[in-house]
Swiss-Prot record:
Location in or out of the cell: Cytoplasm
Associated pathway: Lipid metabolism; fatty acid biosynthesis
EC identifiers of the protein: 2.3.1.180
Function in brief: Catalyzes the condensation reaction of fatty acid synthesis by the addition to an acyl acceptor of two carbons from malonyl-ACP. Catalyzes the first condensation reaction which initiates fatty acid synthesis and may therefore play a role in governing the total rate of fatty acid production. Possesses both acetoacetyl-ACP synthase and acetyl transacylase activities. Its substrate specificity determines the biosynthesis of branched-chain and/or straight-chain of fatty acids.
Catalytic machinery residues: C112, H245, N275
Highest rank taxon of the organism: Bacteria
Pfam families: ACP_syn_III (PF08545), ACP_syn_III_C (PF08541)
Region: ACP-binding, residue numbers: 246-250
Name listed for the protein in its UniProt record: Beta-ketoacyl-[acyl-carrier-protein] synthase III
Source organism (scientific name): Rickettsia rickettsii (strain Sheila Smith)
Gene: fabH
Enzyme class: transferase
Length: 318
């Protein structure tokens, strides 16, 4: 028994900031950003537009795409590292916005790997036969964590949300397999925020060692994917679309090169979305689905890495 995606939806705030606009108040330029990251623009939420609002917009699109009633949902999981409040959870607020009562809802925090983590958790819950329809969301207001004086990080991130509706599969479609990992030994030497509720009462700002993260991303995502391929007796040629975490075009291209995944199979949205953390994969999936390219039976590969470090991959048959 496994879960399948029956609907998806993405939402990006209306405000778009190009590299040239960013260069007006940050010591950077369009060429510097594009050549190092592949990013040309990012969407930025307004001051009163919170993660829960982004989540709601994407959830409504996913519900409509799935053709279900909101009342069919019996569990909500929101993957985020930028909640509106310390508590309640974004998922709880979203449940209220949707008018749902007496169903469980919770947030899952695995940063950029959140959606892959959430997919495995949701699949386990559907496989338990306790839940039939799960709303799984990746939603982030990453710009709230940026130090706009640090050009090595502030140029990388954007805001947005992506949602999927999951139900039990009655055929061979759905989640084929997934793996998730973490390693917290050297978190403060790679990627973290310099604050937190129990540390100093503030959320802090993103601190990142880019070269170290690049090396870890290539090594760990590549091994995660190879493990899945081996475990399921798949070859790279079986993959129809590769949807990696949209962190940096160099990471995406290097992974595709090392794994011998053909260029036309690699989904890239980092140029327009920037790094939306847990929202990046479901946003990219929604973009791909809207293009009309996916057909039934296609094999999709998701893979992500985030702070922690957390990482993992998943195979889905559409």
């Amino acid at each position: 028994m496994t879960c399948k995606i029956i609907g998806c939806g993405g939402y990006l705030p209306s405000k778009i900031v190009s590299n040239d606009e960013l260069a007006k108040f940050v010591d950077t330029n369009d060429e510097w950003i594009r050549t190092r990251t592949g990013i040309t623009q990012r969407h930025i939420a307004g001051d009163t537009e919170y993660t829960s609002h982004l989540a709601l917009k994407s959830a409504e699109k996913a519900i409509a795409d799935a053709g279900i009633s909101v009342n069919d949902i019996d569990l909500i999981i929101t993957c985020t590292t930028t909640p509106d409040n310390s508590f309640p959870s974004v998922a709880s607020k979203l449940q209220g916005y949707l008018g749902l009562t007496n169903i469980p809802s919770f947030d899952l925090q695995a940063v950029c790997a959140g959606f892959v983590y959430g997919l495995q958790v949701a699949n386990s819950l559907i496989s338990s036969d306790k839940y039939k329809t799960i709303l799984l969301i990746g939603a982030e207001k990453m710009t709230s964590l940026l130090d706009w004086n640090d050009r090595t990080t502030c140029v990388l991130f954007g805001d947005g949300a992506g949602s999927v509706i999951l139900q039990r599969s009655s055929d061979d479609s759905g989640l084929i397999d997934s793996n998730i990992f973490s390693s917290g030994a050297d978190y403060d030497e790679i990627l973290y925020t310099n604050g937190g509720v129990s540390m100093n009462g503030i959320s802090g700002k993103i601190v990142m060692q880019g070269q170290k993260l690049f090396r870890h991303a290539i090594e760990k995502m590549q091994q995660s994917i190879k493990d899945l391929l081996h475990a399921n007796q798949f070859s790279v040629s079986d993959i129809d679309y590769f949807i990696p975490h949209q962190a940096n075009i160099r990471i995406i291209n290097k992974l595709a090169e090392l794994l011998n995944i053909e260029e036309h199979k690699v989904v890239k949205t980092v140029d327009k979305h920037a790094n939306c953390s847990a929202a990046s994969i479901p946003l990219a999936l929604s973009t791909l689905k809207a293009s009309g390219k996916i057909k039934k039976g296609d094999i999709l590969l998701f893979s992500a890495i985030g702070a922690g470090l957390t990482w993992g991959s998943a195979f889905i048959r559409w």
